[in-house]
Amino acid sequence: MPLSADDPVATALRDAATAALAQASAALSSPAAPVVLLDGRSGAGKTTLAALIAADWPGPVRVVALDDIYPGWDGLAQGAETAREEILAPHRAGRTARWRRWDWSAQRHGESDAVGPGTGLIVEGSGVLTPASAALADVRIWLESPAGSRRERALRRDGDTYRPHWERWAAQEDTHLALDHPRHWATLVAEVP
């Protein structure tokens, strides 16, 4: 998403990035590299915020998008659990995290990926902030944004690929909100117009 100085969405995301970096800097003195979780419904601005945080991160950092992990359009919960088990838990334990990316074209698992324990980690995606994952992160962000704005941004970004799946995905997000209460676990809540 292009960011302009007079755009209220850009301003909200820049402010959230500044606050997230301040929280992450407090964790830099711990033995494990800091972990940031970014959750919010589709189109809230998670990917853009992750890029803003990574751009000013003080050291090596890796952004992992759950879009590369979800096993298809019905895989929100499974993608979040995969991130917790295969990325967050090993990283927090000081081990290299290893996982397989999802190949959306072939509809199956694809290439392997990894991140070392000394690298800061930003994991962004709907469903990532749960009670179990919250314990594995230093900074936990929930992005709140009106449904109409989110839908417009998401469909502008992904167009006809996403349009037939919007309601299906939103239902999985509803389940996540009801079961996991991600806003409750957030150390930072950002309101994005």
Regions found by a protein language model. Give the residues of each.
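ATP-dependent NMP and nucleoside kinases share a basic, alpha-helical "lid"
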Residues: 111-115, 120-156
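Conserved nucleotide-sensing/catalytic segment adjacent to the nucleotide-binding pocket
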Residues: 62-64, 69-123
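P-loop (Walker A) phosphate-binding loop of NTP-binding proteins
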Residues: 41
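NTP-dependent small-molecule kinase module
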Residues: 1-30, 135, 139, 152, ...
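Post-Walker A helix-loop "phosphate-sensing" segment adjacent to the P-loop in P-loop NTPases
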Residues: 54-63
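Conserved lysine of the Walker
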Residues: 46
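Small-molecule kinase domains that catalyze NTP-dependent phosphoryl transfer to phosphate-bearing small molecules
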Residues: 108, 113, 130, 159-193
